[in-house]
UniProtKB/Swiss-Prot annotation:
Keywords: Chloroplast, Plastid, Ribonucleoprotein, Ribosomal protein, RNA-binding, rRNA-binding
InterPro entries the UniProt entry points to: Nucleotide-bd_a/b_plait_sf (IPR012677), Ribosomal_uL23-like (IPR013025), Ribosomal_uL23/eL15/eS24_sf (IPR012678), Ribosomal_uL23_CS (IPR001014)
Subcellular location field: Plastid, Chloroplast
A Pfam family of this chain: Ribosomal_L23
Protein name from the UniProt record: Large ribosomal subunit protein uL23c
Organism: Trieres chinensis (Marine centric diatom)
Gene3D superfamilies membership: 3.30.70.330
Record-stated family: Belongs to the universal ribosomal protein uL23 family.
GO molecular function ontology, one term from the record: structural constituent of ribosome
Quaternary structure and interacting proteins, as annotated: Part of the 50S ribosomal subunit.
Disulfide feature: none
Gene Ontology CC terms: chloroplast; ribonucleoprotein complex; ribosome
The encoding gene: rpl23
Amino acid sequence: MVDSSYFNRSSTNIIKYPIITDKATRLLENNQYSFIVNPYSDKITIKAAIEYLFNVKVIKVNTCHLPKKKKRVGKYLGWKSHYKKAIVTLSQGDRINLFAEN
């Protein structure tokens, strides 16, 4: 088991930000949330960080590495860096509030 004091310091380094796209909002109906995470973190630390930050019960974590892509600015060619995406499935009664309520 991972020590909880570790997540006190580094949970924000593991979970970068949530993904808000059409596909990600469709996944919200199935109680699945998408996040961009640190590319070097594994499923166990992602699960523990989500449970610590949002106080929810995580059932499953699916991850995938997305490749770097070409980016052209004028005549110069560069690369957008690669990143890691995690799709987190929560238990039936839990919920993460991603959108601000007015």
